[in-house]
Amino acid sequence: MTNEEPKRTLVISTIENGTVIDHIKAGEALTVLRILGITGSTRECVSVATNVSSKAQEKKDVVKIEKRELKAQEVDRIALVAPNATINIIRNFRVIEKKGVIIPPVLIGVLRCPNPCCITNTNEPVMSRFEMHGKKAVCSYCDAVISSDISSHII
């Protein structure tokens, strides 16, 4: 008998091709799924692990999506709710690309302006445009500020 702690393993099946989103803030995996438009009727095989022990964070969430690689705009949206996330591209069971997410300084067509009178919320064909100032997003058209609950403004 030893004093060593038993080894703990995370058992989520590996994927052959697709994307693994790791180091999501604990409790945000379902928000990430919503951002990606993944619902119960989605055709992709999706694995979700929540509140998993982590060395880098106390707890984390992980999302694995078979046969799908994320678009840049999807990664930008994920960065808003999971700024420490890592995106792993998997091909033939191997990680071929691994990168952290970065919140871009300007977000176009990613957030909905909270100002109902903003030109982006009218019938005009204008995409929203926000500049990031720390954790605040400022509308480039009307100067409305989103400083909390940014995930509820993601388009």
From Swiss-Prot:
<feature type="binding site">
    <location>
        <position position="113"/>
    </location>
    <ligand>
        <name>Zn(2+)</name>
    </ligand>
</feature>
<comment type="similarity">
    <text>Belongs to the PyrI family.</text>
</comment>
<dbReference type="Pfam" id="PF02748">
    <property type="entry name" value="PyrI_C"/>
</dbReference>
<dbReference type="GO" id="GO:0006207">
    <property type="term" value="P:'de novo' pyrimidine nucleobase biosynthetic process"/>
</dbReference>
<comment type="function">
    <text>Involved in allosteric regulation of aspartate carbamoyltransferase.</text>
</comment>
<dbReference type="InterPro" id="IPR036792">
    <property type="entry name" value="Asp_carbatrfase_reg_C_sf"/>
</dbReference>
<keyword id="KW-0665">Pyrimidine biosynthesis</keyword>
<keyword id="KW-0479">Metal-binding</keyword>
<feature type="binding site">
    <location>
        <position position="142"/>
    </location>
    <ligand>
        <name>Zn(2+)</name>
    </ligand>
</feature>
<feature type="binding site">
    <location>
        <position position="118"/>
    </location>
    <ligand>
        <name>Zn(2+)</name>
    </ligand>
</feature>
<dbReference type="GO" id="GO:0009347">
    <property type="term" value="C:aspartate carbamoyltransferase complex"/>
</dbReference>
<dbReference type="InterPro" id="IPR036793">
    <property type="entry name" value="Asp_carbatrfase_reg_N_sf"/>
</dbReference>
<dbReference type="GO" id="GO:0046872">
    <property type="term" value="F:metal ion binding"/>
</dbReference>
<dbReference type="InterPro" id="IPR020545">
    <property type="entry name" value="Asp_carbamoyltransf_reg_N"/>
</dbReference>
<feature type="binding site">
    <location>
        <position position="139"/>
    </location>
    <ligand>
        <name>Zn(2+)</name>
    </ligand>
</feature>
<keyword id="KW-0862">Zinc</keyword>
<dbReference type="Pfam" id="PF01948">
    <property type="entry name" value="PyrI"/>
</dbReference>
<dbReference type="InterPro" id="IPR002801">
    <property type="entry name" value="Asp_carbamoylTrfase_reg"/>
</dbReference>
<protein>
    <recommendedName>
        <fullName>Aspartate carbamoyltransferase regulatory chain</fullName>
    </recommendedName>
</protein>
<dbReference type="GO" id="GO:0006221">
    <property type="term" value="P:pyrimidine nucleotide biosynthetic process"/>
</dbReference>
<dbReference type="InterPro" id="IPR020542">
    <property type="entry name" value="Asp_carbamoyltrfase_reg_C"/>
</dbReference>
<comment type="subunit">
    <text>Contains catalytic and regulatory chains.</text>
</comment>
